[in-house]
Structures are given as C-alpha cells and as structure tokens.
Amino acid sequence: MATRLANVPQREAGTILERKEQALKPPAMFKVVLLNDDYTPMEFVVMILQQYFSRDRETATQIMLTVHREGKGVCGIYTRDIAATKVELVSTHARQAGHPLQCVMEEA
C-alpha cells in the first residue's frame, strides 16, 4: 500500500511540471577607496596597494598620487564581502603601523 506524504502535492499521471526561470542579478559592486591624510608616508600607501590590491609598483604609485592630489583614490572594485574584508585588512595594518590612513568602501 502506498503511503501519502504530508505537504507533498499530488498530481495526475502524465502531468508535466515546468521549471520557472529565476532571474539572477549580478552582485552589487563596491569601490575600495583610500583617503588622503597629511601623516601617512607615500611609500606606505604604495606598499598597501601592492600587498592588498596586487598592484604593480607603477600602478600603485599612480593611485597613491591620485590619493595625494585629489584627496582619495580607488584601489579596486569588488563584491561587498571582499571589499569589506580589504577595508578591514588595510585599516588594521595602518593602525598597527601607527598611521592614520583611512580606507572606506563606496557603492560602485
């Protein structure tokens, strides 16, 4: 004797179930941004860009100069979790090194 499962809809023989297509959205992206200050050495900023954002020395120097001249510079664009992790890593490293360097994330 067949047992009937609770909460399982019964269907007639020959019924075809159609699968609904789900529209997947790409994840929201966030810019990781370094903010200028008058105390953090430029060389430290270049090192941060190389170590945490995998920038070559030339690119890191260009971003550092943008931070210096314009007040802020974009290090990279990432998903929310990765951006938040990079902000925390950079902020912790700067704090441990005794520098007031600020790193924030902004919606891209």
Swiss-Prot record:
Q: Which Pfam families match?
A: ClpS
Q: What does this protein do?
A: Involved in the modulation of the specificity of the ClpAP-mediated ATP-dependent protein degradation.
Q: Give the protein name, as stated in the record.
A: ATP-dependent Clp protease adapter protein ClpS
Its domain of life reads Bacteria
A Gene Ontology biological process noted in the UniProt record is: protein catabolic process
Q: Which Gene3D superfamilies match?
A: 3.30.1390.10
Q: How does it assemble?
A: Binds to the N-terminal domain of the chaperone ClpA.
Organism of provenance: Cupriavidus necator (strain ATCC 17699 / DSM 428 / KCTC 22496 / NCIMB 10442 / H16 / Stanier 337)
Database matches in InterPro entries: ClpS (IPR022935), ClpS_core (IPR003769), Ribosomal_bL12_C/ClpS-like (IPR014719)
Q: Which HAMAP family match?
A: ClpS
Q: Which family is it part of? A: Belongs to the ClpS family.
